[in-house]
């Protein structure tokens, strides 16, 4: 879905992908109060907040979703009961690449949250280092990681940095094809029929918090935390497009 700028137009389009959704709730976390939280809900809220900020700054914004739904138009073999199969999960991410390309986006931003053991914490930003625009990927990833981490820690939250990393270390090996591919489908290159239509613009994917850490999960689930992340993401995007940057 596309949203026109509400501020003076800058004639730039940003594609925001709220990770997961619909049959795929993403990671399941918890807050300090014991409330169960779902990654797909949190990414959507951050996406929508970021959209409003960017539109006011003059950007045209295209988003992967505006509610709890898949991006993919579901087909045979995509669901098992009410959840995605491995095929469905893969097809859903491919659909996000298609959306970004059809939007003629100048920049792609993946919004996700991390998960792991309860002791795992910190922010990480991934980029793809083998695309023709790898230098721009890295430049934006550094801005995104720096600005989001600085905004959170300016409030005394003490979020560790997991740094800016190549997407070759961040993908999930859902099957042998995913393992052989070795990249995030949202950011990575073409790979036969597995990724026939990769994204065609620079981009990065951020996971600002571990929602399986109750402290970080509480931040991710709070409106204040979501707004802080959104403002910092919008700042990084604005810096990326700054003249002479």
Spell out what each predicted region is.
Residues 1-14:
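N-terminal pre-catalytic segment of deacetylase/amide-hydrolase enzymes
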Residues 3-6, 37-245:
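Active-site-proximal helix/loop segments of hydrolytic enzymes
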Residues 11-36:
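Short glycine-rich His-centered loop
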